[in-house]
């Protein structure tokens, strides 16, 4: 292992900030934005809190310069991490809306 490398067995959400939007037709299914910090070391901004017929979910930031398709800039590579992030963000969202 290179001296500049450090292995992390798992990532954990250590902080969540949520901005809740007032519902309105102009926002569509968007309910808010979230910023998370992983392991106190990596910040990810621009997570979208979305509503669908199956309930709330977290959408990941996309590249605004990609014209044809949505290109995600950040994606969890395991189901466990995706579920962990979604649970933390949606729990904080539910607390914020009371």
Segments from the language model and where they lie:
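Single-stranded nucleic acid-binding surfaces, predominantly the OB-fold ssDNA-binding core
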Residues: 1-98
């Amino acid at each position: 292992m290179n001296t500049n490398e450090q292995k992390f067995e798992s990532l954990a959400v250590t902080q969540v900030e949520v901005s809740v939007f007032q519902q309105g037709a102009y926002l569509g299914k968007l309910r808010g934005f979230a910023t998370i910090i992983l392991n106190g070391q990596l910040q990810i901004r621009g997570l979208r809190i979305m509503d669908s017929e199956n309930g709330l979910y977290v959408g990941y930031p996309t590249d605004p310069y990609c014209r044809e398709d949505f290109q995600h800039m950040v994606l969890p590579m395991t189901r466990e991490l995706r579920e962990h992030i979604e649970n933390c963000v949606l729990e904080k969202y539910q607390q914020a809306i009371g």
